[in-house]
Regions:
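Active-site acidic catalytic loop and adjacent metal/ATP-binding pocket
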Residues: 44-58, 68, 250-298
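A conserved long alpha-helix in the C-terminal portion of kinase-like catalytic domains
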Residues: 244, 283, 292, 307-314
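Conserved NTP-binding catalytic cores of kinases and kinase-like/nucleotidyltransferase enzymes
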Residues: 1-155, 279-283
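ATP-dependent phospho-/nucleotidyl transfer catalytic cores
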Residues: 2-4, 145-151, 157, 166-268, ...
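Short small-residue beta-strand/loop micro-motif enriched in glycine and branched aliphatics
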Residues: 77-79, 167-171, 285-286
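Short alpha-helix boundary/capping segments
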Residues: 80-87, 173-183, 292-295, 311-312
């Protein structure tokens, strides 16, 4: 398939049919004759991309009524950031190679396509260059880091099973119950256990360590941008103890990064409640763009830190 749709508007019935057939979802007399694209009830436009529901017209026993299509975000800085750690390609690689291996519920892979990377080692080279910069250059770089997050012209599209029927997404303002979070923690533990010590994951495109080889930049961004932003947004309820914790976590961030990157097992990387579908049975884990080899404690800490209700923290 030489043509790759770059946006939902470019999707065609012919392309969807070919994509689904290429991964064995459609067979023989199964055919997609027409499509209708609709936005999801909860928006579908997030930090990293545009997600839509595609209604399928056609015939055949293997033809589902709908599927989900994912595309990169149109926001330049956001896309540059996601491509900085190869997030779009990382998620496609997960669905192509690992989705059937993980012991957690995930949508089925209905097809995908992306342009080849022009230089797969670009982020590694960038990390080496940045690490050699003097401190003053680091500060200048991080003063407005977004202007350096330039996206590529690569096209990415991912088609997955629509599992939205009879499921609920809990956003971060209305997080799930403690019982539901315990379910997710159990699923993550199963994921971590099943991949524990797998040496073959180190160089897989879905599991490579995230671009965290430049901790000085991250620390400067935290100090120069994130910490003041937190003060501006939440100063009315931040206590002195909160501020001390923020400062301490910033100071030790580089060391924490080293622990997070310890290659123990496969981690989801972004298990917030709004990346999980809740319904009958086990939770369904979505959004694998930040998956990597790392420390399992990161997944659990991220889940509880982002999704545990304030009243349940203690």
């Amino acid at each position: 398939m030489t043509f790759i749709p770059a946006t939902a508007e470019e999707l065609t019935a012919e392309w969807v049919d070919d994509a689904m057939r290429s991964v064995g979802v459609l067979h023989g007399d199964d055919h997609v004759r027409g499509i209708r694209v609709a936005h999801l009830s909860y928006g579908g436009v997030g930090l990293s991309g545009d997600t839509v529901r595609v209604h399928l017209d056609g015939e055949g026993a293997g033809l589902p009524e709908t599927l989900i299509a994912k595309f990169p975000t149109a926001v330049v800085a956001n896309r540059g950031m996601i491509e900085g750690f190869d997030g779009y390609a990382r998620e496609i690689a997960f669905y192509r190679d690992l989705a059937l291996q993980v012991p957690v519920r995930v949508p089925g892979h209905y097809g995908s396509a992306m342009d080849p990377a022009r230089f797969a080692g670009a982020t590694d080279v960038a990390a080496k260059v940045v690490n050699r910069l003097p401190s003053r250059a680091h500060l200048a770089l991080t003063a407005d880091i977004t202007k350096f997050m330039r996206p590529t012209k690569r096209r990415y599209v991912l088609l997955i099973e629509d599992m939205g029927a009879d499921t609920v997404v809990h956003d971060l303002e209305e997080p799930p119950s403690v019982e539901q979070l315990c379910q997710v923690a159990g699923c993550l533990a199963g994921l971590h256990a099943s991949f524990w010590g797998r040496q073959d994951l180190a160089d897989h495109p879905a599991t490579r360590t995230l671009v965290t080889e430049i901790p000085r930049v991250f620390v400067n961004v935290l100090r120069g941008r994130c910490r003041p932003m937190a003060e501006d947004r939440w100063s009315s309820w931040l206590t002195d103890a909160d501020r001390r914790r923020l400062d301490a976590s910033t100071d030790r961030f580089a060391a924490d990064l080293g622990v997070i990157n310890e290659p123990h097992t496969y981690v989801h990387g972004d298990p917030r409640s709004d990346n999980i579908l809740f319904g009958a049975g086990d939770p369904i884990m979505l959004d694998w763009a930040m998956s990597s080899v790392g420390h399992p404690g990161y997944d659990i800490g991220y889940l509880l830190g982002s999704s545990l209700r304030r009243d349940d923290k203690g």
